[in-house]
Regions:
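C-terminal luminal/periplasmic domains and tails of membrane-associated envelope-modifying transferases
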Residues: 1-128
Length: 128
């Protein structure tokens, strides 16, 4: 059977298959999942994009909350990792903003700023 005879797979099906094989709750390489949120935005599936972003944001919030529970010595030791987690968190918000999901972005940026304040000196200084 020639390649011409195969139907093209709809982008939504590709994203669904990928998300099925990389479940966020069990798969730690979260940056590889971000493009699927972007993909959902591109095909007009805003709620699906938000669902992925919310799951990824929750993971970042959990990590930041964990670091916040640590001693100052531990926070200092993990300062670079904390900074990286905040930057990953912020990048998730940019996905929504760049895809004109401004309502979601506005809601989430408030939460981001609260987590940033919670970490005090270990938060990040991002121009928003």
């Amino acid at each position: 059977q020639s390649v011409e005879n195969f139907d093209l797979i709809h982008p939504e099906k590709v994203i669904q298959m990928a998300m099925k094989n990389m479940p966020i709750d069990y798969f730690e390489y979260y940056t590889t999942v971000e493009p699927f949120a972007e993909g959902y935005y591109k095909i007009g599936k805003k709620e699906e994009a938000r669902k992925i972003l919310n799951q990824l944001i929750k993971k970042q919030q959990e990590k930041i909350t964990f670091f916040n529970s640590q001693s100052e010595k531990q926070k200092a030791f993990y300062a670079r990792e904390i900074n990286d987690d905040f930057r990953r968190y912020y990048m998730l918000l940019l996905i929504a903003e760049e895809n004109n999901d401004l309502e979601f972005h506005r809601q989430q940026i408030v939460k981001f700023n609260n987590y940033n304040k919670m970490m005090g000196d270990y938060g990040v200084d991002l121009e928003q």
